[in-house]
Amino acid sequence: NTMIDAMGVVGEKFKRNEIFVPEMLVAARAMKKGVEILKPHLAGDNTVSAGKLIIGTVAGDIHDIGKNLVAMMLESAGFEVIDLGVDVPVEKFVETVKENPDVKIVCLSALLTTTMPAMKDTVAALAAEDFRSNIKIMVGGAPITQEFADEIGADAYTADAASAAEKAKELAA
């Protein structure tokens, strides 16, 4: 729990512009390594998972720094993260939700304005499969705005990794 609290401090400092993306990445990577080292020793602990979620950069977009940072922050917040990587087709998001009925949130990332339609298509496909009653969709990335998130029917938009972890906790509650 101390490491999770420390990442919370890092997130707050990032929001206040006291640290920047490189420092966040260093802290998140340190947290991830620490968790990897401690995980075998925690096998019997009673830590409750915050839930399972899926994250990926939408089709046509190969950028992953922001997505990776968000994934690390979500893991540090106690989520089990299924990272689909980059350039993820709509069908892969749908298939992964089908294979993981306990998923609570699907996180979609895009850096390029040209791939924003793929984000819209993914939200529509998840709705067409009737998953929307069981999962929440969170979107983010440089060109994404709250207005766009509302327009495509996403449940949440966050502008940075620290906010993403906080919002995911709210959505999973």
Short names for language-model regions:
Residues 1-139, 143-151, 155-173:
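Domain-level signal for soluble alpha/beta catalytic cores
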